[in-house]
């Protein structure tokens, strides 16, 4: 030992890492005994000092970091700006989430780093600081939560909650923070429990694989080795990892520097020798590893290397397998939840920032950079090579070099302030992360209409889908609006000055009830929650469902259409709409009760000739029970074609209705129950039951009679026939017929009885199997069809007073074919006969071309009285948006007085004098000159849509006066556009009509002598609530009033505005929020320009959503979206978290050889290397064997690197040799692939690699096999010991197979002996007879083999070394 005088005194704080290093050096120099003596002294000293100090912990010792205030404030400011950018549509949700998390993570980390220097400066003997810093109790991250900030938390799914906990535990948490903290804490507790069990099971499987590996020999005589080089072709291996890899190994080859041998084969590498080799700059060092050991079920001392416990070569008999398994499994149980701040959103992928040292101007070469977008959505420049950035201030010029693939966040010649971030250096570009693809769905915040910019690829990704891909960064817009039930009914035709209710059929999307009707099942089932509340059963009776066309005075309000339920009875065929009405007042008594009349209007509002206009269900022809309809061979005329007729009942097969020429039909009742296949039926087929007999567990019969059970596909049909059972004798005539109706008066001719029948009966012959047949006589209900129903009965006389050329005829239809069964659902009744009103019109010359007419509802208000009418218009009515070619250019409006009216409207004066109700507009209708097309305009009467006008705008009285000249409608002072109309050419001639309606079809403004240039776009209707109706026939959108923004541009500065900004506001243009339109104020909301006028612009509010390339857009252009619909799916890659909670599954994934989605970054280089190498392999005998060998070597190295990387990311040091022993076991089997060795092995059999080689050499015959990677579980079940396999998993299967095959267990492993209670064949004092230490013999054998196989062995070693250089992704990882 050195003299005390020569010792150096280190006055330093020693932490845990330094202690570890010190102890390993002491063991190296002085051995175990001396080191333990020194450590005892250190322990005693520690206890003495701790007793003397007697540290206690109080709440005052938790000192908050002073810089926390401004750090948190700064982060909040950044988050606020980020939120704004997201709102403006500059960044999308994924970028926002990413950046938000990075901002708070960086803040939290900075605080954590500040903590120790702060303690050191202010209070170095602070108990909290001493405890955490020494590692005695707690660690930095726990103390950081006490005195710094608690930071980001994960939710139970492992996703980040992007709201951080800004408080620390010393300050206390707010309510929100407390709840989020509970999330994180709960996840922590659950993760700890799960991790402990996972790690325990992983350890068990690892030990299972390698329990039999014991050091049995000193040298196996291998000449193979693996070369390790500090300077790999791809990147530098860090020196620390290089030293860790080499220390404790044994050299496989001599190392020469020049001609001098500095280290020889089989020499173990200590720290001194390794340092010397590094100093000499040795290129590659070949070392022995467990991979190169030639043994199958054991390992030799030299291939294993030094024992980790005492620093000498491992001793014979040591169970190194179990040590390896424990070493890999143990960190999983011991590690605390490290860095679980990120919950896997990103890991250590935070970039280094380059900050400006002082204020100044930035200069760089713009040719070397290229504009891009960072992953946070910021504009930046990407530099491809080293870029020199100069910062010039008044007196200093500072130059910074930025490495390639970094982002430059400032522009050339930009002024920067001190400490401003100017560049972002990404972390080492070669580090290979496990990436996972994550989908993030963006949902619509509001209802509206979808618009794309032109950048979306309009062809969907798949033929039948509505998913479109985005080729470049662009915006998607959701234009505000609410869907309206059907704009086609509303706006088919309106008469001039009709007042109309705009939200007439508006329906909530979710309340259109679905019809659950099977074929031939008559009644409809309305699944509506509103109905369910009002009635016990969810299926209301028929009479309540059918609305009414009320009669007396025809006073209706639109809300009578089941408005509280909002149920429109949408039919199976989508082209029809059924609108039931309810009357307000009582009906006059002479009319039929209002239980049934319903108007049926097609959903597009178009009637064809002979189509049904209304129908009436007479309650006399209504049955509650199921049954069969019969009308024998009576004549029936089919009067309506299938395509024009809709089956009201929802039957899938659209049968034509039959008009009855005869006035009688019959109904044979029966009780029918349709039961699921699995029902337990409590009655037998052909048995007779009484009333209220239990049929199944919860169904009782309503009538008594004969049971018939029919089993059909997936259901059971159970019928109960009521009636008499008649056992006939041979002479009975009735018994010969089956299924016939017998009228009254005919008797049963029978020897015993002769009886006249009072009613019709139905005779049915029934033959139960193997029994005598009998006849069932069933009662029949007879119905007469009355001809007395006509128009006068159904409707009052004055209803159709202007029906000049409209014809309405009344028909009775039987709704079921002859012999067809009718089925009722639950409580609903069945209508057998329907009275229908068929619509037709005159065939005069003028309208002979009209094959179809339009119908719609009109609500007219007169003197406070509100009336609803149905109007059928016999004019061709295409709302024209675009002028037809044959129109003369000066075509204008013609009054529509000569139109053929269906009904008269109350005097116009009444309409004008009354004050219009809030939800009404007035329709102006124009007929174009050629009388072929119509257009309409809804004018409004109030100014409630003038949202926040500018105060300085004055309205001119001229407008109002010009309107009064021709008093069309009462208009209050309303500056805004009231509607839009078709092409206008001769503008000034129609000034009185159109002044107030500065037509909204202006495409752009040109202020040249106030001549306007008009161009046509889509028309919109605006009502007085400010609701705009889109007249597109394919979309039903109502825009909401509150979401329209009006901007008034004062006429005085309008010229200046155009001149200065030289912007042209064009219709349809989109604006993001905060963009300046007018000179004085920025535009506050985002939207689309809808109307441009001389003094105002109307903007339809819209919300932009940014989407980046590769995003998937759902839905089609102009599709109506509802709140919560998916708009976009972002697919982005995120690094899988290096968190141990996620890290353990990753280790397990590698060891179980499950697929990983990611592909290695240097795959291309590997393939090139293979191509070079393959030519050498092909020329060698046993080339396939070398191929398999190379594959196995490569996979082994790759697996070791992957596992090491996970542990190193956690700061856990595990020696490579432990992992190598495990990996060797899972890669040591090959699969026999062909019949080449059928005399020895079977194809598909798993055999050891070394065994395959030896067998091949012995038989001098090629074995075809391929390398397989077994997971640790499969490897445990493919060992030489069936006792070991059986004690692991699948005990019965393993033992049964072993018995059938007659397997022998030689009890070589540890586990088998433990199971059978024998002595464990391991340990340094174990019987030496088992340990083969004949080193001399091995060497002699080796020499012989080398002579015989020198060609093969030498070449192979070269290939292995060569391959090691190009495929080694470096053990460092």
Curated annotation (Swiss-Prot):
Catalytic activity from the UniProt record: RNA(n) + a ribonucleoside 5'-triphosphate = RNA(n+1) + diphosphate
Cellular location(s): Plastid, Chloroplast
A GO molecular-function descriptor: DNA-directed RNA polymerase activity
GO CC terms, sorted: chloroplast; DNA-directed RNA polymerase complex; mitochondrion
Enzyme class: transferase
Binding site for Zn(2+): 220, 293, 300, 303
Main location class: plastid
Cofactor: Zn(2+)
Enzyme Commission identifier(s): 2.7.7.6
Family: Belongs to the RNA polymerase beta' chain family. RpoC2 subfamily.
Subunit structure as annotated in this protein's UniProt entry: In plastids the minimal PEP RNA polymerase catalytic core is composed of four subunits: alpha, beta, beta', and beta''. When a (nuclear-encoded) sigma factor is associated with the core the holoenzyme is formed, which can initiate transcription.
HAMAP family referenced in this protein's UniProt entry, alphabetically: RNApol_bact_RpoC2
Job of this protein: DNA-dependent RNA polymerase catalyzes the transcription of DNA into RNA using the four ribonucleoside triphosphates as substrates.
Protein name per Swiss-Prot or TrEMBL: DNA-directed RNA polymerase subunit beta''
Organism: Lepidium virginicum
Gene transcribed to yield this protein: rpoC2
């Amino acid at each position: 030992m050195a003299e005390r005088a020569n010792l150096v005194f280190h006055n330093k704080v020693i932490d845990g890492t330094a202690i570890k290093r010190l102890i390993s050096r002491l063991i190296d120099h002085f051995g175990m005994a001396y080191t333990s003596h020194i450590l005892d002294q250190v322990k005693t000293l520690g206890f003495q000092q701790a007793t003397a100090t007697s540290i206690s912990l109080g709440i005052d010792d938790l000192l908050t970091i002073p810089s926390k205030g401004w750090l948190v404030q700064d982060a909040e400011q950044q988050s606020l700006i980020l939120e704004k950018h997201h709102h403006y549509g500059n960044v999308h949700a994924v970028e926002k989430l990413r950046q938000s998390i990075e901002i708070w993570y960086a803040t939290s980390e900075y605080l954590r780093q500040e903590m120790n220097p702060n303690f050191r400066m202010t209070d170095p003997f602070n108990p909290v600081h001493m405890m955490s810093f020494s590692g005695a109790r707690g660690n930095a991250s726990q103390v950081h939560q006490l005195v710094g900030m608690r930071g980001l938390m994960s939710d139970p799914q492992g996703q980040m909650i992007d709201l951080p906990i800004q408080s620390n535990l010393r300050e206390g948490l707010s309510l929100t923070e407390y709840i989020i903290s509970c999330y994180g804490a709960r996840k922590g507790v659950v993760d700890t429990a799960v991790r402990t069990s996972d790690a325990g099971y992983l350890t068990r499987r690892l030990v299972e694989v390698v329990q039999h590996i014991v050091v049995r020999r000193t040298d196996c005589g291998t000449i193979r080795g693996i070369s390790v080089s500090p300077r790999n072709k791809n990147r530098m291996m860090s020196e620390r990892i290089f030293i860790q890899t080499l220390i404790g190994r044994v050299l496989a080859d001599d190392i020469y520097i020049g001609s001098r041998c500095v280290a020889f084969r089989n020499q173990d590498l200590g720290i001194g020798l390794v340092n010397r080799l590094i100093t000499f700059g040795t290129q590659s060092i070949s070392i022995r590893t467990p991979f190169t050991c030639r043994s199958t079920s054991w390992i030799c001392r030299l291939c294993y290397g030094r024992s980790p416990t005492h620093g000498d070569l491992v001793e014979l008999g040591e169970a190194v397998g179990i040590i390896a398994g424990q070493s890999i499994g143990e960190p999983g149980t011991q590690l605390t939840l490290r860095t679980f701040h990120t919950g896997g959103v990103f890991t250590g992928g935070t970039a280094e920032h380059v900050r400006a040292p002082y204020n100044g101007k930035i200069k760089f070469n713009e040719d070397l950079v290229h504009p891009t977008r960072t992953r946070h959505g910021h504009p930046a420049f990407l530099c491809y090579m080293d870029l020199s950035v100069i910062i010039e201030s008044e007196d200093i010029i500072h130059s910074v070099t930025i490495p390639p693939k970094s982002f430059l966040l400032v522009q050339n010649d930009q002024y920067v302030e001190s400490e401003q971030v100017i560049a972002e250096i990404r972390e080492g570009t070669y580090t290979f992360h496990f990436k996972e693809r994550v989908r993030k769905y963006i949902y619509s915040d509001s209802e509206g209409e979808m618009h794309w910019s032109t950048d979306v690829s309009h062809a969907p990704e798949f033929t039948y889908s509505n998913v479109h891909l985005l080729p470049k960064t662009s915006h998607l817009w959701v234009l505000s609006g609410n869907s309206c039930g059907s704009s086609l009914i509303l706006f088919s035709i309106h008469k001039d000055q009709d007042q109309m209710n705009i939200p007439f059929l508006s329906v909530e999307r979710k309340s259109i009830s679905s019809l659950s009707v099977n074929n031939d099942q008559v009644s409809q089932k309305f699944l509506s929650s509103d109905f369910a509340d009002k009635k016990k059963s969810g299926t209301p009776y028929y009479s309540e469902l059918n609305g009414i066309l009320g009669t007396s005075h025809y006073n209706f309000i639109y809300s009578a259409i089941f408005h509280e339920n909002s149920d429109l009875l949408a039919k199976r065929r989508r082209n029809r709409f059924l609108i039931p009405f309810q009357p307000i007042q009582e009906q006059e008594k002479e009319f039929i009760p209002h239980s049934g009349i319903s108007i049926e209007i097609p959903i597009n509002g178009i009637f064809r000739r002979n189509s049904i206009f209304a129908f009436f269900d007479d309650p006399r022809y209504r049955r509650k029970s199921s049954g069969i309809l019969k009308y024998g061979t009576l004549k029936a005329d089919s009067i309506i074609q299938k395509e024009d007729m809709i089956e009201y009942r929802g039957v899938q097969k659209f049968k034509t209705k039959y008009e009855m020429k005869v006035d009688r039909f019959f109904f044979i009742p029966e009780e029918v129950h349709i039961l699921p296949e699995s029902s337990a039926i409590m009655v037998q087929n052909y048995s007779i039951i009484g009333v209220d007999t239990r049929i199944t567990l919860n169904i009782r019969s309503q009538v008594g009679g004969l049971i018939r059970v029919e089993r059909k596909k997936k259901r059971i049909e159970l019928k109960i026939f009521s009636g008499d059972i008649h056992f006939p004798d041979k002479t009975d005539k009735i018994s010969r017929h089956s299924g016939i109706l017998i009228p009254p008066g005919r008797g049963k001719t029978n020897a015993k009885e002769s009886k006249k029948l009072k009613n019709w009966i139905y005779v049915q012959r029934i033959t139960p199997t193997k029994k005598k047949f009998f006849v069932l006589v069933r009662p029949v209900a007879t119905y007469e069809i009355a001809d007395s129903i006509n128009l006068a009965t159904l409707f009052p006389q004055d209803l159709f007073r202007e029906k000049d050329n409209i014809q309405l005829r009344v028909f009775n239809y039987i709704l079921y074919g002859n012999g067809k069964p009718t089925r009722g659902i639950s409580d609903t009744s069945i209508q057998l006969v329907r009275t229908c009103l068929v619509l037709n019109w005159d065939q005069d010359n003028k309208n002979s071309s009209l094959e179809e007419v339009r119908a719609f509802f009109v609500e007219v208000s007169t003197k406070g009285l509100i009336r609803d009418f149905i109007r059928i218009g016999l004019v061709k009515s295409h709302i024209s948006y675009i002028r037809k070619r044959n129109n003369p250019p000066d075509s204008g409006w013609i009054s529509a007085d000569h139109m053929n009216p269906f009904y008269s409207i109350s005097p116009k004066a009444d309409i004008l004098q009354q004050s219009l109700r809030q939800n009404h507009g007035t329709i102006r209708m124009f007929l174009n000159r050629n009388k072929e097309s119509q257009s309409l305009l809804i004018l409004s009467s109030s100014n409630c849509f003038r949202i926040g006008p500018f105060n300085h705008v004055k309205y001119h009285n001229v407008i109002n006066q010009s309107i009064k000249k021709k008093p069309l409608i009462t208009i209050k002072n309303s500056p805004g556009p009231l509607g839009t109309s078709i092409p206008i050419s001769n503008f000034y001639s129609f000034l009185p009509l159109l002044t107030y309606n500065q037509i909204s079809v202006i495409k752009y403004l040109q202020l040249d002598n106030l001549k306007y240039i008009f161009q046509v776009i889509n028309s919109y209707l605006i009502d007085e609530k400010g609701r705009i109706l889109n007249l597109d026939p394919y979309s039903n959108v109502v825009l909401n009033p509150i979401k329209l923004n009006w901007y008034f541009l004062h006429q005085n500065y309008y010229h200046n505005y155009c001149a200065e900004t030289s912007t042209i506001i064009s219709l349809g243009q989109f604006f993001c929020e905060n963009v300046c339109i007018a000179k004085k104020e920025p535009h506050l909301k985002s939207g689309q320009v809808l109307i441009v006028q001389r003094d105002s612009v109307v903007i339809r509010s819209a919300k932009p959503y940014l989407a980046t390339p590769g995003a998937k857009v759902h839905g089609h252009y102009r599709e109506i979206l509802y709140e919560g619909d998916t708009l976009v799916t972002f697919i982005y890659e995120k690094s899988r978290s290096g968190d141990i909670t996620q890290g353990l599954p990753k280790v397990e994934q590698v060891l179980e050889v499950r697929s990983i989605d990611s592909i290695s970054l240097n795959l291309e280089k590997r393939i090139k290397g293979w191509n070079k190498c393959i030519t050498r392999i092909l020329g060698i005998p046993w080339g396939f064997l070398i191929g398999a060998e190379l594959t196995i070597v490569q996979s082994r190295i790759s697996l070791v690197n992957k596992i090491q990387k996970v542990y190193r990311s956690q700061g856990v040091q595990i020696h490579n040799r432990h992992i190598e022993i495990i990996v060797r076991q899972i890669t040591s089997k090959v699969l026999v692939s062909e019949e080449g060795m059928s005399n020895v092995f079977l194809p598909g059999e798993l055999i050891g690699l070394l065994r395959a080689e030896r067998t091949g050499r012995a038989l001098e015959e090629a074995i075809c096999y391929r390398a397989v990677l077994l997971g640790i579980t499969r490897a445990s079940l493919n060992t030489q010991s069936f006792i070991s396999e059986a004690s692991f998993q699948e005990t019965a299967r393993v033992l049964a197979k072993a018995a059938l095959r007659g397997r022998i267990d030689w009890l070589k492993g540890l586990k088998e002996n433990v199971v059978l209670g024998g002595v464990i064949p391991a340990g340094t004092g174990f019987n030496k007879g088992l340990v083969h230490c004949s080193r001399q013999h091995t060497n002699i054998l080796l020499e012989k083999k080398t002579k015989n196989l020198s060609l093969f062995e030498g070449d192979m070693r070269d290939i292995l070394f060569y391959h090691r250089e190009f495929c080694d992704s470096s053990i460092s990882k």
